[in-house]
Each structure stands twice: as C-alpha cells, then as structure tokens.
Amino acid sequence: MHPNDQTIFALASGRLPSALAIVRVSGARARDVLAALTGALPPPRTVRRVRIRDVNHELIDDAVVLWFAAPASATGEDVAEFHIHGGRAVLAALVKALASFDDVRPAEPGEFTRRAFENGKLDLTEAEGLDDLIHADTEAQRRLAVRQLGGLLGDRARRWRAQIIEALALIEAGIDFADEGDVQGELMAPALRTIATLHGEIAEVLAAQGKSERLRDGLVVAIAGPPNVGKSTLINRLARREVAIVSPHAGTTRDVIEVQLDLGGYPVTLIDTAGIRESEDSVEQEGVRRAKARAAEADLVLWLGADEAIDVAVEGSAPVWRVRNKIDLVPQADTVGADSGGAGLAANLWQTEGNVAAREAFGISAKRGDGVGDMVEALAGFAAQYFAASGEAAVISRERHRLLLQQAEVMLRCSMTVGLAPELVAEELRLAAGALGRLLGRVDVEDVLGEIFGRFCIGK
C-alpha cells in the first residue's frame, strides 16, 4: 500500500505530561479505529465522552473523542481525535493500540498538513502561512502569518491565474479563427485589456512590498567595536540575561554570539562580535574576521568606539549608529545638560568630535542601564520603519513568493509587446499562469514540498 493511502496518527498537542493530550488520526481507517477502540462511532462533529479500550478490551482512559467524516475535515480525509489525559503512560498505551491496526502508522512531520494541501483544503501559500504562524515569535510575525493562512496572497493568485487562463483562451481562439475576418482582433482586444490590468495589479504588489518577507528571519543588528568597550555587557543588558562572558581582559569574545529579541513586536537578532583590532593571535584574528563579515551582513550596526575607526572597521552599506558607552565614568561636570537617558551627553560628545550630523548617536551605560531604554526605543522604531510594508498592506511573506510574482510580472509585460505574434503572446501567458500555479503549489512544485512540509512538527 502506498504511504499516502495509509492511515496516520500523531500527538497533536504539546509536551507531556500535561492536563490533556490530543491524538489525531487521519485516513481511510480512522472510522474503524475509532469504533474499535470506543465501541461505537459518534455522530460527526460531536463531542463524546467514552472509555477507550485496546484490542484486548483493557481500559486505556476515560476520555473525549471527536469524529469528522471526509471531506469535511482538516485533511479532507476521515479524521478522529482522542482527547486523553496527558500522562506519558496513557499516551503510550493509546499509541500502542493504534499501531496494532493494519495500515495504520505514525505520521511523518507535516504529513497532516501535506494531506490537507493534496486534498485541496489549503494551497501552498496558506500552508506556508500555517508554518509561519507555528514559528511566529513576535506580534508582527503572527499578524502576517494569520493573514497568509487566511488566503491573503493565495486568493489573489488564484484570481490572477484564472483571469490569465481566460485571456489565454481568447487569444488561442483568435489564433484558431485567424482566417475569419476580424475575429482575431475582436478576441485579442479584451484579452490584452485584461492582461494590462493584471500586470498593473501584480506590479503594484511588488512595488508596495518593502522587506515583509524578512519578518520570518528578523532584523539583524551587529554590536561592533574595539575590545573592552562594553559590547558583551551591552548584549547581556539587552538580552536581560548572561549570554556573553564579560572580562576586563581584551579579546575575551572570540566568536559571534547571537540573541533573538522582540522589539516593539518585531523580531531582532542581536549579534555580539569579537573586538576589532590588530592582533597576532591566530584565534583572535579569526574572531575579528568573522566580526567584520557579520557586521557587513547586518541591517544595522551599533558601533562602540572611536568614530574615526568606523569606516575602516565596518564594511557594507548598513547604517551605523555610534554608541558612547560608560557614561557613568564621565565626570559629573562633563555631563551638565545631559538628560536622564544620556542622549544629551551623546550630543555633547558628538559636537566635540565635529560629526553630530553624520550618524545617530547615543550615550549609555551598559553596566548601569543609563540611556539603554532610549536606544532600545530607537531600535524598535528602526525595526518598524524597516518592516514598513509588513503591515496590513503586506502580501508577500517569503522570498519564494516574490520571485514567482516577479516571473509572472515579466511574462505579462512581455506579452503586451507591441506587434508580438499571437502565438508568442499565448506562450508568455502560459508561462505567467505556470508561475502563479507554482506559487499556489498546483504545478511542478514537488521539489519544494518536502522542504516546506518537513519544517512542520509531527502531528501538524
């Protein structure tokens, strides 16, 4: 029997032990399994309290079950759910009983969702939205994932593809009736109007998107600078826990340390890098090389150190914010006019260096926390601006979406080339429809399905 024809089961709830656990069963034998273990099949979509017994009539649990007949279920197949007490022994006994049935096996990661996709319960963009929702760590990620799961992009792509196919049908009909007077022109005209409208809509979506697909990975902020300026102390302060070793000895941090933060609902990856300086220690040299490479890849760099060293040490096009640390060590006489957060002090320091307008500047004490709140607030504002298109207007949530929409847009634009033969217009439209079909997971996507569904947990 083909694996897709087998009935699958898995724990669909969280880690045990817990108050309750949910075991989901999907497939042709779900009905038989439920009836055999509970003694009767409950009405569809009805909660029933039952006694679950194994094939030897040994009591497993006093539990609740639900029954969903195909196709009105999450997977489009017959589905049974066992809501049992969340003890490990209870689950083990139920799993043993389920595995005793022929053609019933444990599910692979993401197999329930893949069956839902294959049975037309959701398209590939919605499946990706579900994956993003499961892995969402921040409010902004959750909002975008919920909209994608609800068909934000999928509904548009289906409509666009259907209209392209309609236009293609008109053009092909015109080709068939090319010898019938002006029939071809009469059929081509409305098709080209439709194509122009669709091209405009897709181009508008692509133009409106900023970096919304980056929400899945988050903004990358590198903390860079020479040794012993407080980089590790700052990342510990921002992480609110000890993630980096703090030592008075220069060169303590040898490797890149990463911390995930939620700033204003946006995901931010904070990177503590090795102190950038000349060194004859081969290990420290490698740390400095990695620090420079990571800073060059960052979306924002927080530079702790002398301003004149920034352009030499930091490569790449990311904006650089100058952070003057250890303001608690500055004599009181030098801090007159500084506000409680240290921003005023930062401005004074910048003015003495004659570079006040060059970059954002902050004066902080990573050790005491002075000024850190102002800097965090500014970082949250930077993240919000960076992900500006990830609000309610965002449609694209993955790079795959963008690439396929770009392909469709190019094909539609080519199809509108003045003087292009109808046969070539039809071919461009076929390619555009194919790109949208791959976006939805309806054509030629077998190579990406395993990667997408393999990210899901078992039981989803």
UniProtKB/Swiss-Prot annotation:
Entry's EC annotation: 3.6.-.-
Domain TrmE-type G: residue ranges: 218-384
Keywords in alphabetical order: Cytoplasm, GTP-binding, Hydrolase, Magnesium, Metal-binding, Nucleotide-binding, Potassium, tRNA processing
HAMAP family assigned: GTPase_MnmE
NCBIfam families for the chain: mnmE_trmE_thdF (TIGR00450), PRK05291.1-3 (NF003661), small_GTP (TIGR00231)
Family the entry assigns: Belongs to the TRAFAC class TrmE-Era-EngA-EngB-Septin-like GTPase superfamily. TrmE GTPase family.
Record's protein name: tRNA modification GTPase MnmE
Lineage of source species: Bacteria, Pseudomonadati, Pseudomonadota, Alphaproteobacteria, Hyphomicrobiales
Gene field: mnmE
